[in-house]
């Protein structure tokens, strides 16, 4: 079971544990992952993700999954998130054609 965020691709990072006497020992920082179900308003569909707390807070701040994916650069997103972003763009383009 890999500890990778499904949307951002964030993985564990490395650093040092520093003691009071300033000795440094290597350590890893794991990603705080949560299993969540997010709803896409444009696609009218639910998606299951394993995402980090930081990503979840950012999605809430941006106003939902659709707005987060559309405003975020594709190079910062994982392959799974890029596919969903492409589906959202396609659906919004079709809705724009229908409303004309």
UniProtKB/Swiss-Prot annotation:
It comes from the Bacteria. Gene3D superfamilies: Ribosomal protein L28/L24. Coiled coil: none annotated. One of its GO terms (biological process) is translation. One of its GO terms (molecular function) is structural constituent of ribosome. The keyword Ribonucleoprotein applies. Keywords: Ribonucleoprotein, Ribosomal protein. GO terms for cellular component: ribonucleoprotein complex; ribosome. Pfam families: Ribosomal_L28. HAMAP family: Ribosomal_bL28. Belongs to the bacterial ribosomal protein bL28 family. This is Large ribosomal subunit protein bL28. The lineage of its organism: Bacteria, Pseudomonadati, Pseudomonadota, Alphaproteobacteria, Rickettsiales. The gene is rpmB.
